[in-house]
Amino acid sequence: MNPVAPTRKVKPPRNRPSDRRQARKKARIKTKGIYLRAIKDAFVKLNPKSAIKNPVMFVVWVATLVTLAVTINPDLFGPNQQKNPQLFNGLLTGILFFTVWFANFAEAVAEGRGKAQADTLRSTKSEAIAKQLSPDGTIAEVPSTNLKQGDTVYVVAGDIIPADGEVIMGVASVDESAITGESAPVLKESGSDVASSVTGGTRIISDELIVRVTSDPGKGFIDRMIALVEGAERSKTPNEVALTVLLAVLSLVFLFVIATLPAFAYYADTPVNVPTLIALLVALIPTTIGGLLSAIGIAGMDRVAQFNVIATSGRAVEVCGDINTLVLDKTGTITLGNRLAEEFIPINGYSVEQLASVAWAASVFDDTPEGKSIVRLAEKLGIRYDLDPNLAQAVEFSAKTRMSGTNLPGGREARKGAVGAIQGFVRSRNGQTIPELDAAYERVSQQGGTPLAVCLDNEIYGVIYLKDIVKSGIRERFDQLRRMGVRTIMLTGDNHITASVIAQEAGVDDFIAEATPEDKISVIQREQAQGKLVAMTGDGTNDAPALAQANVGVAMNTGTQAAKEAANMVDLDSDPTKLIDIVSIGKQLLITRGALTTFSIANDIAKYFAIIPVIFAAANLQSLNIMNLTSTNSAVLSALIYNALIIPALIPLALKGVQFRPLTANQLLQRNILIYGLGGVIAPFIAIKLIDILITLVGLA
């Protein structure tokens, strides 16, 4: 291939105060746009095809048409003895119309947030010109939409990466803020399972890369995310479907009750007209939760999206609320990751300098953070192995051998790795291990570090102490999960002693030491066999089977394509700890739905006492008029006005969610019954009475 001239480095722009003010202004404009679009969409949703999807609100929709007909012709269902029936029926029609419209508005606002996110993602796509590399090394400029899987492209500083792909040559900094919102550039390089993955629409800000395209047009990561976000409102979760069926059954029961009332009213010599019966029906059916149910589900996905996580469906978010077990990798989730060499511990009569020299040789080709830290620590001591890298051969780490190193000139072998693996290697070369190694191993392990043994041929020189730090506050977060009934299991490749020390410090419930990728699937299957729901995170190709097996699998955006496709959530920030937040959001979704359902049903009690006593006042039920409402008209209008206004009043709560507290199921139930059950009874009594007073003052009673 023709040589490419080096490019100058481009500094990423800094966030100035004016930039932040502009960002806040854009956020306000975006919110205003969401509400303006929702107002329009709420009218569009009045069409019968949309209305019938919500059985409860469809009843109100039909009731609105009936009262409209009665407003036009008050004697439609027989002679009407009511004073000024057209005014009353007209007011009734208007209130019912706005009840349906407010429910549509709540759903449209929730959907609008998803559409806004889809628009943001869509804006990252560009019709850029790509520099396509042909097999003979020549560069041809083609539209990015013409690229297909398997093509190779060349990108330099300032270019937009034209399609999803894998880096096959080069090292560069990439700005992924258009997707993740994180301004810090991300290093991309070839030869890494994770850092070699790039996303179309991101921008390269320094150096250059050669990328192999991994997706066809319209099937890239951003395309899939747009499809997921825009399709969020169309798929109901199983719990949402079950609750919808329950609300529909309750509505049918109340419809049957209302249908039988005229006969009882005739027997009691207290005739009831059709508009009043319709008002009673609407007041009794659970319109509050019926109007907010879709918004709650869609908002759950939106709250996850605000954490920069894309869920494949509402079901994935909801399942998070029922999670019993979290399977977590130690490195990067529980600890800070990037273990660094802290100390050389020589044994067997060797000096620190001799151990550092062999460790340097075993790590000179190791590009991992751990390997580079070993080289740095040795060079800090002024130690290097006398080695010509051109005459040496790298030995890559593998999960099977659990060690890596260098084949040196003259047939010598420098290795570093797990203590057990190095012991086996030395024995296979007719060497011997000594008790001093076990003492060094235990010393490092008891400090929560990772011991790496170092050998040259059949002689063990000592142990490298790799230091890892448990993230601050992680123990408190695990305590919160435990109070919610969620069990945590830590997986680590460390030995049993190190794993035990870190598990105790972090406060996890269980751990698996010296874990392999197969252990992830085994522990998930074991937990699922006990009837538990399991969540886990992963980023590598070897994590894909476990991500697919888990009930909730969260793939890192920096992970491989296989991991993203196997998971049902993708974290754009690639932060494994976010799984804990996602579980909390799932539980908040379920709690919000339960709380508003409780509030809605409790509301019916107050509305019952508002309307029934005044309708059947002649049947000696006036004593039940404990609110002392002025008249039948004022009672009906007051109850229905409250019934309509409570829906927009609760939209912020439905979108934001009920405040989440890490409590047990019984404690949550008691709290919700007290706040939303008792509150759902008391609030309507007060509100309906105040509305009745206002109606009386304006002369509509």
Curated annotation (Swiss-Prot):
Keywords, in A-Z order: ATP-binding, Cell inner membrane, Cell membrane, Ion transport, Magnesium, Membrane, Metal-binding, Nucleotide-binding, Phosphoprotein, Potassium, Potassium transport, Translocase, Transmembrane, Transmembrane helix, Transport
Catalysed reaction equations from the record: K(+)(out) + ATP + H2O = K(+)(in) + ADP + phosphate + H(+)
Entries under SUPFAM superfamilies matching the protein: Calcium ATPase, transduction domain A (SSF81653), Calcium ATPase, transmembrane domain M (SSF81665), HAD-like (SSF56784)
Gene Ontology CC terms, in alphabetical order: plasma membrane
Subunit record text: The system is composed of three essential subunits: KdpA, KdpB and KdpC.
EC number: 7.2.2.6
Transmembrane regions: 57-77, 90-110, 241-261, 278-298, 599-619, 635-655, 681-701
Origin superkingdom: Bacteria
NCBIfam families attached to this UniProt entry: ATPase_P-type, kdpB
Region (Disordered): 1-26
Topology class, membrane: Multi-pass membrane protein
InterPro entries, per the entry: ATPase_P-typ_cyto_dom_N (IPR023299), ATPase_P-typ_P_site (IPR018303), ATPase_P-typ_TM_dom_sf (IPR023298), ATPase_P-typ_transduc_dom_A_sf (IPR008250), HAD-like_sf (IPR036412), HAD_sf (IPR023214), P-type_ATPase_bsu_IA (IPR006391), P_typ_ATPase (IPR001757)
Role of this protein: Part of the high-affinity ATP-driven potassium transport (or Kdp) system, which catalyzes the hydrolysis of ATP coupled with the electrogenic transport of potassium into the cytoplasm. This subunit is responsible for energy coupling to the transport system and for the release of the potassium ions to the cytoplasm.
Family: Belongs to the cation transport ATPase (P-type) (TC 3.A.3) family. Type IA subfamily.
Descriptive protein name: Potassium-transporting ATPase ATP-binding subunit 1
Record keyword Transmembrane present: yes
Annotated disulfide bonds: none
Provenance organism: Nostoc sp. (strain PCC 7120 / SAG 25.82 / UTEX 2576)
Location (main, coarse): membrane
Endpoints of the signal sequence: none
One of the record's GO molecular function terms: magnesium ion binding
Protein's cellular compartments: Cell inner membrane
